[in-house]
C-alpha cells in the first residue's frame, strides 16, 4: 500500500499538530477549517490522512494545502483502518502536542484551546469525555448506543489503564507527542485512545466535557456491529500486550480527572 504526501512548505515550527483521518468528508471540511482558523491556538499544522475518498475531499484538501502551508495531505492507495491512518499521520507530526479528531464536525474544534490549556498545565493526555458533568453522548441509534457502552465496559474489564477514565473509547483527544510509542506495523483498528491510555499510565490525564454533535452531512463511518466487535477485541488484546511491554516503566503521579469550565 503506497502513501504520498502533498503540501506547500509547512510552518517552520508548529507547536500543535491536528490529525484528521478522512473518508468522504467533503461536505464538512470547508466549515471545519474555517472554524479552526478562527480559534486562538498556538502555531498549528493540520495533517489530513485521506483513506480513499471519492467525494472530492482529497481535491479540496489538496487545493487548501497549495495556499495554506499549515495543511498537509497524506494519500493512501488502499483502504485501511482509522487507527492505521492516524498513526501514519502522527509519525509525520511536527508539533510538540497532537490533537486527534474527526472531520465530520461531531467533534467541535472549539474545544482545542481547552486541550492546549490542559497540556500546558502539565497533562500528558487530555480526553474529551461524553460522560463527565457537562458532556453528553447526544442522540444515537439504540444499537450504536449498546455497542458503544459495551465497548467502554469491556475496555475497563480487560484493560486496567482504561479504568480511571469515564470515556476510554473517545475519538477526540490530545497528547504530548513525547508520550507516544509507535505501534507495531500493521496494527489495525478504530480506537487509538486505548493504546494512549496504556502509554500514559502513571502520567497526568485530564478529561474535559464535550457534547457529541449530531452528524450534519454524510453517513457514519462506523462499521457493522459484528465487524466492529471482532476488530475491537483484537485491539484490546494488542493494547494489553503493549501494557506488558511498558510495565517496567516507573509509576508517576496518579491519574487525575478534571473538568474544564
Regions found by a protein language model. Give the residues of each.
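N-proximal low-complexity "stem/linker" segments adjacent to membrane-targeting elements
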Residues: 1-37
